[in-house]
Each structure stands twice: as C-alpha cells, then as structure tokens.
Amino acid sequence: MTLETEVQSLRQVPMFRDIDPARLKLLAFTSERVNFAEGQKFFQQGDAADAAYVILQGKADVAVDSAGQEIKIAELGQNAIVGEMGILSDTPRSATIIAATPTTALRIDKRVFLELLTQFPQMSIAVMRELASRLEKMNAQLAQARR
C-alpha cells in the first residue's frame, strides 16, 4: 500500500476529512502500518489507550467482556477508526478489537492524535459529532432492547 493510498483512506474517515492533504500525508508517514492475522487482537478491553487505529484493509470485530464471555457487538470495515475513545477520555480500552479477516491498519500514536485535535478545531468538532452519533445509536439500541 502506497503513502498516497493511505492518505486517500484517511480522507474517508469523517474526522480527518477537512485536514489539509499535506498534514494527512505527514500523519500517514509517521503512523505505523500494522498487519493483523485473522483472530489477532488489536488490543484487549482494559488495556491502556496508547493509540488509535484506522483500518486500511480488512474487517475487525468489536467485542466486550460480559461475565467472562466475549460478546461481539459490532463489525468495523475499511476506513473505520477505532481506539480514539480511550485516548479522548484517558481511560482503559472499553472493548476488545479482533481482526475478523487479515487486516492492515495505521496505528496513530496517542500524542500525535491529541496534537491533531489541538491544531485542527474542525477535527475536534468532527470527533464530538462522531461520539454523539455513537451515543445516539447506543441509546436507540438500549431502548429497543427494553421493549
């Protein structure tokens, strides 16, 4: 995968859409490319939140521990970002992310991610919108489950 392809993938992530292409190129260049085999974990629920990941290729499952059993709650695909919530809240990982297929991702270090938020207010707004959207979906799911 080329640097330009990685920049194109980053542009598909809502919170990175309005960032200057030169900055995205720098972000892609400084981020670590990580390959995960099917079944391999990006991180485990409870781990320290030290990075966010953008899925470039492949799929990953989001699972949570419930009474000692891992329960899949979502599936993520290409151009999805994961791990940013723990960085923003400075709390341990709230879920486990497992590669559902062979997956390639960009690992964005916590320090770099937080610097981007500081430098680009529009990214901070996009992050807030994404988190609000997730909360809204979760509330709807909870309401549905109670019926």
For the regions a protein language model found, what residue spans apply to each?
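Cytosolic regulatory regions built on CNB/CRP/Popeye-like sensor folds
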Residues: 1-147
